[in-house]
Amino acid sequence: MHGRGQAHPKMLVGSLAWKVRLEQFFTNVAAVSAHTKTHAALMAEHGMNTYQGIMGFYEGWAMASSDEVEKGIALMQRSLALLEAKNVASHRPHFLSLLAQVQVREGDFQSALALCANALERARRTEQYYFDAEIYRIEGEARRAAGHPLTDVEQSLVRALEVSREQGARMFELRAAIALARLWRDQGRKAEARDLLAPIYGWFTEGFATIDLKSAKSLLAELST
């Protein structure tokens, strides 16, 4: 009985960690915030520190994605440092890309680009390639926001599209296509943008309440006028 009693909170923590990853994937900020608070309460109640760095990072991401940007960025950075100190290599390319995305929103484009370069290098070193498409997409958006040549922006976004297709990562493909379609729209290439995005959006049969699919639908409507 004692062993099962000890295992129970660990199982809850593991379940919360997976829920947080899923909710963050779909940019559900409120859900991520709620799950990380539940995790913190469990840690305090049972004197545990399981997933401390990982869940701390997600908590920081939720804060930075709402109205506590500076505190959120600081917590994301502290959590990354904690994971580095513990030599935890998993998640790092993904986390670096998420921090880069926050920095793009805050206008710190050079930091964002440096984080993307670091994320790609870490992915190569640790053979964690599953977020490469997202890293290239964020790199492209950082380049565009920073005023880099549009050929460089397009190169990053096309690479994001290629990688997502190679990996069969449909949601990442959709995100890359949205970013590239917006670029082409602003260049007056509306027909090309629509032809790129429409079949990718058409592949989906569910999830239409998610931010990504709503964005794709809205953009397609604009491109069709």
Identify what each model region corresponds to.
Residues 1-225:
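Helix-coil-helix junctions within alpha-helical repeat/solenoid scaffolds
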